Amino acid sequence: MEVVPAEVNSLLPDDIMDTAITLVDEDSIEAVIVSSPIPMETELEEIVSINSTGDSTATPISTEPITVYSNHTNQVAVNTTVSKADSNTTVKPAFPSGLQKLGAQTPVTISANQIILNKVSQTSDLKLGNQTLKPDGQKLILTTLGKSGSPIVLALPHSQLPQAQKVTAQAQPGDAKLPPQQIKVVTIGGRPEVKPAIGVSALTPGSQLINTTTQPSVLQTQQLKTVQIAKKPRTPTSGPVITKLIFAKPINSKAVTGQTTQASPPVVTGRVLSQSAPGTPSKTITISESGVIGSTLNSTTQTPNKIAISPLKSPNKTVKSAVQTITVGGMSTSQFKTIIPLAAAPNVQPIQVPGSKFHYVRLVTATTAGSSAPPVSQSPSVNTQPLQQAKPVVVNTTPVRMSVPFVQAQAVKQVVPKPINSTSQIVTTSQPQQRLIMPATPLPQIQPNLTNLPPGTVLAPAPGTGNVGYAVLPAQYVTQLQQSSYVSIAGNSNFTGTSGIQTQARVSFNGIIPSESASRPRKPCNCTKSLCLKLYCDCFANGEFCNNCNCTNCYNNLEHENERQKAIKACLDRNPEAFKPKIGKGKEGESDRRHSKGCNCKRSGCLKNYCECYEAKIMCSSICKCIGCKNFEESPERKTLMHLADAAEVRVQQQTAAKTKLSSQISDLLTRPTPALNSGGGKLPFTFVTKEVAEATCNCLLAQAEQADKKGKSKAAAERMILEEFGRCLMSVINSAGKAKSDPCAMHC
């Protein structure tokens, strides 16, 4: 090791010389050891100059806060501040008083990559902006683990040298010998290594190179003070202390890499920093004049499998092709990774693979000139492997068709409904037989027109759907069907009539006579969810198709005859007498109908529609088992309800007729030409609004809109102009109608 010259040692303040040098074995060295790597980022926002030969004037140095942070809970806050000093101001770095001394006095062995931390003495005031910092303490050296070969640079303020010593140092740089000094060292790793120390003094900015002393000095064994890093650094009451500072600015995209901070002396842009020591290779850092302030810090730690990201925007910046990271504590395994944000984000293209836990990126060569380090992004939780040449990844480019096979077959098969009396047939694409696929929705135009068929034609059902067939009868046969009179028991009016709603013959099954159901109007059903295929649907229970009903999604019609027959069969399987009339006809000659079995009402008073007697509009008889019956001849409640029921049926018929008439009128309006309604011998004004008049009016409105657009009118003004034009068009139509009414000859000519 080289001895620090006595002149440098004499320049140190007296307040740090409070401990004597004690030589102890190296086994008793106590240090704060950080087992896990501490990723840190550094940046040199402004570059200062250092020269070994120069005049005695002080160099103006800008204020520079430096904070080293860690990703762990115990954060080390290091604030090194160099104030802009005048010629009579002492320049000293500052360090917050958040560290405590621990352990006994032990000798120190200085490792590589050290950060020299000084505190401002009590007499000197450090000005930062409008605030003054007056911390006190002693000088510390923060060291990290690294391999041998890196010298230690001790930067001392040039203003502390007396004038006589400055001249002596400049005249005889190699003969000066300084007594050993006491410097407290903080080691983050605990592995001591012998490193040469190089004394450097501050120089004027006019110097071009940073030269070390020709006679290497040896830093003697000094006293080691171990410190404990607090979780929360204390803030001095004398002024604010920056506890965390990220050196790498994302705006300027500084190329600062590694997990450990490497401190370097202040360097002037455009200058070359050279270090020479016996047995150590020389390293050169060249910083060119560019818009990005900062430089790439290189280390000698051999971690060839880690590549740091250094996107460079300045085309004239020279960087080593392989920039390596720094590992704390000698741990160079790949399980600790660092993610450094890239300024040139488009150079890394992420690849998303469905169902994969790993993240993949595609490396793209940077387009900027002068950048030689490829960008690499690493995941913090995944052990990455060396990336090879990127290959295109194709993930499911073709659509996948998924089918649920009913049987194990190779071909995609379409299963058709299976007939009852035949074996199952599977239609495949290999068969030459063709099948007609009918739509599921009912289409009236596909149904055959029964009125155009000749009399006597038999409509055979589809095979396997049942034995029910239809026969086309002449119109005179339908009119000759027996029609029974409608008997009203509401009063003595003897109202008789027939229904005009039922227009086609009903199909008789299970003993139901079509003339009986067609002889009187039935209340329309209001089914919504039963598809009109349940017994509580009156139309379905009486064997009738729904006609002019208020039901929705009805299947009780010819379009869904297959579903209807299946529902009838299911009902008959449960109850063979389900469709037999509960209210049957009497003997021949009797006008009144009677029960086949009586009702069993308990709370409705037999005045609800679910009472079989009341629904059939007959009175309860002796065979009924009802309780509290009000369905008898002289019951006032029954008379009132029957009148209301009759009125409701009449109202339903009127509404149905009105709907039919309205639909016919609408169809006539759509098919016939322009209506000519006479009003006092002339046409009404709206009859003049023909298709040609409407087109001419629209053209006028569009012309007004274009005119407003050309004049640059506002939206409200344009709307006003269009509405005024529309009013003028309507007035012209009305005037034309008035002239035609006053002159009938012109209308007919």
Swiss-Prot record:
One family name in Pfam for this protein: TCR
Site keyed Interaction with DNA: positions: 574
Binding site for Zn(2+) 4: 599, 601, 606, 611
PTM-bearing positions, type Phosphoserine: 264, 282, 310, 314, 635
Annotated spans, DNA-binding: 523-536, 599-612
Binding site for Zn(2+) 6: 606, 620, 626, 629
Swiss-Prot/TrEMBL site (Critical for interaction with target DNA) positions: 536, 610
Residues noted as binding Zn(2+) 3 in the record, renumbered to the chain: 532, 546, 551, 554
Molecular function in Gene Ontology: metal ion binding; minor groove of adenine-thymine-rich DNA binding; transcription regulatory region nucleic acid binding
Entry binding sites for Zn(2+) 5: 599, 613, 620, 624
Residues engaged in binding Zn(2+) 2: 525, 539, 546, 549
Family: Belongs to the lin-54 family.
Protein name as it appears in the record: Protein lin-54 homolog
Source species of the chain: Rattus norvegicus (Rat)
Gene name tied to this protein: Lin54
